[in-house]
Amino acid sequence: MAMNFVTFNQDYSYLAVATSKGFRIFTTDPFAKSYETKEGNIAIIEMLFSTSLVALILSPRRLQITNTKRQSTICELTFPTTVLAVKLNRKRLVIVLEDQIYLYDIQTMKLLYTIETSPNPNAICALSPSSDNCYLAYPLPQKAPPSSFNPPSHAPPGSTHVSPTTGEVLIFDALKLEAINVIEAHRSPLACITLNSDGTLIATASDKGTIIRVFSVPDGHKLYQFRRGSIPSRIYSMSFNTTSTLLCVSSSTETIHLFKLSHQTSSREGSPSSALSRERAASQSSLGTSPDPDDPTDDMESSEIASRKHNGTLMGMIRRTSQNVGSSFAAKVGGYLPKGVSEMWEPARDFAWIKLPKTNQTAGANGNAGSLRSVVAMSNNTPQVMVVTSDGNFYVFNIDLSKGGEGTLTKQYS
């Protein structure tokens, strides 16, 4: 039996696992099996909070909404191409295909809106759990340049978008069904984005994986930026705690990082949060790694991106509004700093970290293909981090919220 997919529900009280032989649902505190079925090869599973409603992808293009309590099927939908991700909150159901996003009213299952996107094979998309701040975030679609080539009449229509070359995030109001902002998060294409439980913060990481940034939603002010490390790494999972005071990040390395969201670690101050972080920073710099292309000390890129013109388009209007707000904010804060320094601060390091136990899969992993994948979440009731790995292990680590430092493994299940 192979594990195909694993996810926490919106408040991290449940864990859902899709396998080649059905799916399982567990409570996280205490950890215990809540529901199991051994039928079907389930590619993706998503829960709606702690309800009995579950969304399943049974074949590449077929979605089934199931009531686990009644053991009944509510509805089934078939899509034109492979479903790559499913997102739920109490208002909306979001289906992510490689070049489209479908939005449904979750009460009636009526299709409300279809969004054309750039190719998005990694299904980079986030839906706020909040019903009030019901925002959807995804990479800004990039239009394909005009082509003089005329395909034959029998050829299928070509794509109107190309893969993104920068890390810009579009914020879409899923209730009003309109785009409301574009956040210029990174120079490199996005690898991971996540929204907090209130829909007021978004964390972003590029495919470099060295710098994590946090912006306010929907206005797009940059509030925090953190350094995960100096060596590029694939970011697999990011998760805010329910009070949005901590951000947990897992990657293709064996270290999981926790960053503290407080005034002291805002992007304008950016000092390392502990002596331990400074020691680890020094040891990493001694490796002689090259500067990170996504490092904010190279943030002169912001002015280059901002100077691009987007006249006559909705995205251009959104972008100019965002830039005007951001410029006035930066001008006020930057006035207190020497010229040339206000855009060149050192990002804060992690407040705490976790080392995953060595397993057969992690042995020899070097951060490339074949490394251990992980999904992270933080407990609502205790200062604990929950980690699920692709080799089928569930770990619980204790974190010292006053001192930070390395987390302690307290529980393990497989």
Curated annotation (Swiss-Prot):
Component of the PI(3,5)P2 regulatory complex. It comes from the Eukaryota. It holds the Pfam family PROPPIN. InterPro entries: PROPPIN, WD40/YVTN_repeat-like_dom_sf, WD40_repeat_dom_sf, WD40_rpt. Residues 262-289 have a biased composition (Polar residues). This is Autophagy-related protein 18. The N-terminus might form a beta-propeller domain involved in specific binding to phosphatidylinositol 3,5-bisphosphate (PIP2), leading to the association of the protein to the membrane. Gene3D superfamilies: YVTN repeat-like/Quinoprotein amine dehydrogenase.
